[in-house]
Structure formats: structure tokens, C-alpha cells
């Protein structure tokens, strides 16, 4: 938590003073995102003061992630980098340069930002559609696997019934063959009865 009190703290500052200084620096560094404010500072000669230039160098600690997360206007870090160059500090005193920067910022918000949001939405929609297609394909593959298992299951029953029918036909075919050995005996009995009847007829 001590980091939020800013860098460059000394032993003379109390914790309350450090916190207040951190809040002041947070507010000031975010004001740098306004080109009109930069033009105001340039026209007042602040950018010619070496102590103020050193202060701008000191404020670069806001670029660190531990501090940048508190910024509501991160565009200020871009202008903070530009202010490190003497050429930019000299040109920003011109009102036309300030107006050009302001117009470019407005154009970015009106067009680029909206286009970027639309691109992000399109990419998100495409990813969602791809995920849905993958899910549908997985479901279709699962249904095909289940259908294939059901169609393959009756095969043993068909083979079993066919083998049963074959065994029945085989047994029915064997029955006459088994009955054939008894035919000669029956034939002999029939022949014996017929010969006995003939003898009786002759005696009469």
C-alpha cells in the first residue's frame, strides 16, 4: 500500500503528506491528456523552467503498472512522453498545433475507437459461431457412434436364429435317416403276415 504514495518520498513527510502528494500528482499527470492545458502551460513559460522539466521526468513513474492502474485517462502517458522532448515543448505553445492535436483526438474517438469496438465484436461473434459449430459436430459424431452401436448389436441374434433354424433343418433331415434302419424289419413283418394269409387261403 505504501507504493500508492508516490516515489521520491523523504523521511520528513508523514504518511498523510505522502498520500496527499500522491493524489496531487495523480490529478496533475492526468491533466496532461488535455492539449489545451499543455498550451496553457507552454504560454506561461513552464516548459522553459528546468525544475519543471525535471518534475516531468520524475512523473514518468506513472508508466509503471502499479501506478498506471489508477489512471482514468491513460492518454496522459502519451503526452507525458512527448513532453520529454524539447521540440514538442516548443511547438505546443502554438495554438494551431494545440488545435490539430485536439482535432486528431476527436477523430480517433469518433472513428477509430468505434471501428475497433466493431472489429472486436465481429471477432467475438466469429469465435462464438466457431464454438457452436464444433459443439454441433461433436454432438453429430456422438449420435453416429450411438446409432452404429445399436445397428451392430442385433447381428449376434440374427446369426443365432439362423444357426437355430439350421440345426432344426438338420435334425428334421436326420429323422428320416434314423427311421430308415427300422424299415427292413417292418417290411419283413408285413411280408410274414402276407405269407400267412396265403397259406390259410391254400388250405381252404
From Swiss-Prot:
Residues 161-194 have a biased composition (Low complexity). Coiled coil: none annotated. GO terms for molecular function: transcription coregulator activity. It comes from the Eukaryota. Belongs to the Mediator complex subunit 31 family. Keywords: Activator, Nucleus, Transcription, Transcription regulation. Pfam families: Med31 (PF05669). Residues 134-204 are annotated as: Disordered. GO terms for biological process: anterior/posterior axis specification, embryo; positive regulation of DNA-templated transcription; regulation of transcription by RNA polymerase II. The gene is MED31. This is Mediator of RNA polymerase II transcription subunit 31. The keyword Chaperone does not apply.
